[in-house]
Amino acid sequence: LYQLKSNPLKGDNSFQIKNVIIEGYEKSNISEIENSVTEFKGNLIGLNFNSIKEIVESSEWVKRASIKKVLPSTLKINVTENDPYAIYFQEGKSFLIDLDGSIITEINLNNYEDDLLFVRGENSPELLEQLIRDISITFPNLTQTLEEVEFIEKRRWNLKLNNKLLVKLPDENIQQSLKNLKQLFEEQEVMESNIIEIDLRIQGRAALKVLDGKINYGIDEI
């Protein structure tokens, strides 16, 4: 809870803003939000709440904001912050992103300690949520082992697991391929094996690369 008690909007009107209360923040820049609010002149009765809402929501970390007037002289702002889901790499920079692909803020990866999913590839943030949804529906345990996802040539995904296993998904029918992958994991104990790559780009087939060569493994459609 943050409360600005001074009156930055000078005037004698009885409904002039004298208090600004900001709630729901943890990582948002409160000074930035405060300054954005104090730029508005007027009283609570004639204040443009949509404009304030838009400006507050343009601040880093703020996903949504609700604005409420509390007569006679208080403006109450409640913010909902973005929830970092992954780290997106683009042109040598690192960004925190939400599951829906919203870029939250740029970070220095060397100073960031949270263990988040790595995301690479053009257009990958916008398509991340659908990928995670497909995995959660067909092979939910896989989300626990995901370390990095990369959108290749703006058409398909590569998945890298925390044991460095690489999974190449096809352009289409991702859910079916994930079902096949789940079957393969169950039958071959993949995480404990010497398999280093599973290529699922050809529907109904899995090309397995192991440490000492490459073998083919047929998977019937489920």
PLM feature spans:
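Buried hydrophobic packing residues in well-ordered domains
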Residues: 20-22, 33, 56, 62, ...
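Extracytoplasmic/luminal low-complexity segments enriched in Pro/Gly and acidic/polar residues
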Residues: 172-222
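Short, glycine-/polar-rich solvent-exposed loops and beta-turns at beta-strand/coil boundaries
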Residues: 49, 67-73, 110-111, 151-152, ...
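Extracytoplasmic segments of membrane-associated envelope/inner-membrane machinery
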Residues: 75-153, 160, 166
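Aromatic-capped interface at the extracytoplasmic side
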Residues: 1-23
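Flexible glycine-/small-residue-rich
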Residues: 24-26, 79-83, 108, 121, ...
